[in-house]
């Protein structure tokens, strides 16, 4: 058990927190392909985003209690899970938005992934040495947004600035290092978590600013840039900081995504506060018009830069379809965009049994 409990008034950390996305790929594509609109009537919008992405195992197996035997061949392992649901009101240049979402991100080295796969399948190989290095970054929050759009060049482009106010209901950041050998795991755990605190103490606040600019640079080419969390500040007033020595012969994931160590876990808990910033995400894109059709080039920076190329064509008045393929790793995207409706589906493989990355976005709007 945890053997020392210390209460501390304030403790600062320089940390980066992962947040749900502000823009969807479908919205970014629509702004490149169409002229911006400032509704003269009150417009209502709702959107939903679900995304899961990893390089360890097929998504279909993610909730299975027992896995088939698998070998992990990469040097770096990760799992990302995002959910976003929000509701917006727009009038002319102003947009007011409210929603909630979560962002879960886990990463680690090759041995951390293999230890997880072995413990969930045939069992840990007692003769093998697993040198584990793993971390997690999780948030659940509500977000209020005020956005203002400035039209550019005869309303063919626009600059947008969005101010977000965050109410954080869950925050977890941690790191686990250690070695598994001869059926025994010995390591060090450092975890910042709101888990175990009363709900009124677990809440935090934050503020972020997003920026985007989309404008024509020639008669046929339009360029765009989107910056999420360009400026940000997050305050989590109450956290449990767990610093512990882990010694266990049983390995299984717990609710924090780390090890459930029974019965030996020695260390200390301190009550701390956290000042952090949100992780920045950058996207740049360009669309080359060819008659009614367009070629699209996009580059997005999350963990690394990911380049995508696509093609769009109309299927009716104010209706478009676009296809896109991304590299490293390969990702296929298809979307339908109309004046009121957007739907996007992206997968790395069309076979559900082997897909490791998938995203669905649905957006619908109407005027009052």
Feature-to-residue mapping (PLM):
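Outer membrane beta-barrel transmembrane domains
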Residues: 238-368
């Amino acid at each position: 058990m945890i053997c020392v409990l210390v209460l501390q008034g304030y403790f600062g950390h320089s940390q980066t927190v992962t947040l749900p996305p502000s823009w969807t790929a479908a919205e970014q594509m629509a702004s490149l392909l169409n002229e911006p609109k400032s509704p003269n009537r009150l417009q209502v919008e709702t959107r939903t985003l679900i995304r899961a992405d990893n390089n360890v195992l097929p998504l279909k197996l993610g909730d299975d209690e027992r896995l088939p035997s698998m070998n992990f061949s990469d040097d770096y392992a990760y799992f990302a899970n995002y959910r976003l649901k929000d509701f917006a009101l727009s009038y002319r240049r102003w947009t007011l938005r409210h929603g909630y979402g979560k962002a879960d991100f886990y990463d680690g080295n090759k041995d951390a992934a293999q230890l997880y796969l072995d413990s969930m399948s045939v069992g840990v190989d007692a003769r093998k040495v697993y040198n584990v290095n793993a971390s997690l970054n999780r948030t659940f929050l509500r977000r209020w947004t005020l956005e203002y759009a400035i039209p550019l060049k005869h309303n063919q482009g626009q600059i947008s600035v969005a101010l977000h106010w965050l109410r954080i209901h869950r925050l977890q950041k941690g790191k686990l290092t250690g070695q598994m050998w001869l059926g025994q795991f010995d390591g060090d755990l450092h975890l910042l978590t709101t888990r175990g605190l009363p709900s009124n103490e677990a809440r935090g606040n934050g503020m972020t600013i997003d920026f985007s600019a989309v404008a024509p640079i020639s008669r046929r080419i339009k360029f765009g840039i989107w910056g999420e969390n360009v400026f940000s500040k997050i305050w989590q007033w109450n956290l449990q900081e767990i610093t512990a020595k882990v010694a266990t012969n049983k390995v299984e994931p717990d609710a924090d995504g780390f090890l459930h160590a029974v019965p030996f876990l020695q260390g200390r808990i301190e009550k701390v506060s956290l000042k952090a910033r949100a992780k920045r995400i950058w996207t740049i894109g360009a669309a080359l018009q060819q008659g009614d059709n367009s070629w699209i080039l996009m580059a997005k920076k999350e963990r690394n830069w990911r380049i995508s190329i696509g093609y769009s064509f109309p299927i009716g008045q104010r209706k478009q379809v676009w296809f896109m393929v991304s590299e490293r790793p390969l990702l296929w995207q298809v979307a339908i965009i109309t004046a009121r409706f957007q739907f996007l589906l992206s997968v790395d493989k069309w076979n559900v049994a082997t897909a490791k990355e998938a995203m669905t976005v649905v957006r619908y709007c109407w005027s009052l």
